[in-house]
């Protein structure tokens, strides 16, 4: 998780929200989650300094999947990369319509992926289900791929 935080901060995220899904492998109790969060925020600060960012992205408290979906509904766009999504053309068209300054939430699945019910809940709450291509990517790779695509699309 520390490596993911470091790299996503370098790529420009403004907030990181750890989410407990049905297939999340590491389960943290409240005490452990709080200690981890302090460490993760220190990693975020270090990565922000290294990449010369003026904003230090917050690592939010651990959320349930339902809480995260509800919170994400307040963003301009919510993306959920999913291996069973329609082809790359729809994803390209959607990304081509995104303008700089758009607040985007991106859900990245755990090891083992999202369950179908989780994808459907996100869709029902306004998420765009997209693909990152025909390959199944590891969690770490999927997150960096999604952010790299967005960075390329949105940076001046």
Q: Positions of the model-derived regions?
A:
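Structured adenosyl-cofactor binding patch, chiefly the S-adenosyl-L-methionine
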Residues: 115-156
């Amino acid at each position: 998780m520390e490596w993911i935080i470091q790299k996503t901060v370098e790529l420009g995220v403004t907030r990181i929200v750890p989410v407990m899904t049905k297939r999340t492998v590491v389960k943290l109790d409240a005490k452990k989650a709080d200690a981890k969060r302090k460490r993760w925020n220190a990693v975020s600060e270090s990565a922000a300094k290294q990449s010369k960012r003026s904003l230090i992205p917050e690592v939010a408290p651990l959320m349930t999947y339902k809480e995260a979906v509800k919170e994400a509904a307040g963003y301009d766009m919510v993306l959920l990369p999913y291996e069973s999504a329609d082809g790359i053309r729809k994803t390209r068209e959607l990304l081509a319509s995104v303008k700089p300054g758009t607040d985007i939430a991106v859900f990245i699945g755990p090891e083992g992926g999202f369950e179908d019910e989780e994808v459907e809940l996100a869709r029902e709450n306004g998420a765009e289900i997209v693909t990152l291509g025909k390959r199944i990517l590891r969690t770490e790779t999927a997150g960096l791929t999604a952010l790299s695509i967005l960075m390329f699309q949105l940076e001046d």
